[in-house]
Design a protein with these regions (language model features):
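A cross-kingdom feature that marks ATP-driven nucleic-acid transaction machinery
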Residues: 310-312, 317-479
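Phosphate-binding site recognition
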Residues: 1-351, 451
């Protein structure tokens, strides 16, 4: 079944190797919601599973007896796989004992794959779920050579705290962990080809700017429609699926969803993000352990990224929004009163959309840093990457991306999203020279500065083109 899976070659190899091992396996797969965790495991092991269960979303169960509902659902899965239990377990200890009984009735010489999806959702308040899971693994499964327990979760911070960094009975018990990330541009292209969706690379990049390479989102695209038609259908028509996704997404992942959404909305306002101190001041969320946990949860779930600006003496940490879907939603849907179901088609050439493409292309380039390094021939060179802005000029020089290399070269990267080859004119050449000289003067760097252009189609040759040392095109980003 693995041939149906787009990309994920390393993850497929890892899971199949674990399946072939003659020892107990406790594998944890985590990553952002909608990224394809469930699909990956089901396609690989659908005819090999001895038990499969998925937790119920607390978002959908709000106000109900959540633990009771989760146990009832778990019992239904047990019965589906042959359990002879006559009643719904009253606790998670009983539920896992019933699972042990079910597995012991099956062939002990055969590899038994147990797949529990959305595991964090089962851990409702005061449920004792983690203790019961410890009992199941330490007291039974860890002693069975044929057991392969695979658990998935979108609540990445829960996975990190309760499994990967557990200080109790599950300390150091997981045998393998896989973080599943969104598709790259190249993997998206592979998906489109496999599903007969015809789209130019130029449009694929714009699609990525809105969907972030999330497999579930791009699976909604309809072949035979233009990108603009699909954008309107998914985001702007009445009851558009992705127009309604934002609240559902955060509420299903985070127990403190309101604080998370407040921080994300703030970070969406400024491309380079804010410091922790600024976040406290602007959101009025109290500084302390709660804020630390919230920022950590957002970061491990790949919604935000922390970084330190190049050559800033305080080494102050900044947080910026890096989830493409969230940025798109907050830019064009959140709080808007427009009811135009053809908003995207009607505004393709407006300054607002042109500016959005330019800013978001920078984020896309950061996500595809490995492809940029490969194009520059420095994949094996240690690098530090960040934006830079002059500290001496109020509205002065700033550089989209600095790649500071261990071989004493600094790639000063300019990102340009264009519909044709990019042309450097006299004014832009002057601007570039100012950026390079200001950067060299303020940072006192001793490395050689290589001006690098990352753009869609390439650089038009003229009298100013020689200043550019290297060009990375969108074709390189798809590799």
């Amino acid at each position: 079944m693995a041939q149906k899976i787009i990309g994920r070659k390393q993850e497929i190899k890892e899971l199949l190797d674990l399946y072939k091992e003659n020892k107990p396996v406790f594998a944890v797969i985590y990553g952002r919601r909608r990224v394809g965790k469930t699909f990956l495991v089901r396609e690989l092991f659908q005819d090999k599973m001895s038990f499969y269960h998925t937790g119920l979303s607390p978002y959908e169960l709000s106000g109900q007896k959540i633990m009771e509902q989760q146990l009832t659902s778990f019992y239904s899965s047990l019965v589906r796989y042959g359990s002879k239990g006559k009643k719904v377990p009253s606790s998670w200890l009983e539920a896992f004992d019933a699972l042990i009984n079910l597995l012991e009735e099956q062939d002990a010489d055969k590899r038994q794959v147990i797949f529990i999806d959305e595991l964090p959702w089962l851990d409702t308040p005061r449920s004792g779920f983690v203790t019961a899971l410890e009992h199941f693994w330490n007291g039974w499964a860890a002693g069975k050579q044929n057991i392969m327990l695979v658990v998935c979760g979108s609540a990445t911070s829960w996975i990190s705290d309760k499994l990967l960094n557990n200080k109790g009975g599950l300390f150091d018990r997981t045998t393998d962990e896989i973080k599943l990330r969104p598709f790259t541009l190249g993997e998206c292209e592979e998906y489109y080809q496999a599903n007969n969706i015809v789209m130019s690379k130029f449009d694929q990049i714009q699609c990525y700017m809105a969907t972030g390479g999330i497999p579930y989102y791009i699976s909604m695209l309809q072949k035979g429609k233009s990108l603009a038609q699909n954008m309107d259908r998914l985001f702007f028509e009445p009851a558009a699926k992705l127009g309604l996704e934002f609240d559902r997404l955060y509420s299903s992942l985070f127990t403190n969803a309101e604080d998370c959404m407040t921080i994300v909305r703030l970070l969406a306002q400024k491309r380079q993000g804010y410091t922790r101190k600024e976040i406290v001041s602007l959101t009025k969320i109290p500084d302390g352990g709660g804020l630390s946990a919230t920022l950590k949860s957002l970061e491990v779930s790949d919604f935000i990224t922390s970084y330190v600006k190049y050559d800033y003496p305080k080494r102050e940490v900044y947080f910026r929004l890096t989830d493409f879907y969230s940025k798109f939603y907050l830019s064009f849907i959140d709080g808007r009163k427009t009811t135009n179901p053809h908003f995207w088609q009607d505004n393709l050439l407006t300054p607002e959309l042109t500016a959005w493409r330019g800013f978001t292309f920078e984020s896309l380039c950061y996500y595809h840093l490995p492809q940029i390094k490969q194009a520059l021939g420095i994949s094996g060179v240690q690098t530090e990457v960040s934006p830079w802005k002059s500290r001496k000029e109020k509205d002065g020089a700033q550089i989209d991306m600095i790649i500071d290399r261990a071989d004493r070269i600094i790639n000063v990267c300019e990102m340009k999203f264009c519909e044709d080859d990019f042309s450097i004119n006299a004014a832009y050449d002057k601007n570039l020279r100012h950026k390079l000289s200001t950067f060299a003067e303020e940072t006192k760097c001793r490395s050689s500065l290589h001006l690098t252009l990352v753009t869609t189609y390439g650089l038009k040759f003229n009298e100013y083109a020689g200043r550019v040392q290297s060009v990375v095109t969108m074709d390189d980003l798809f590799k």
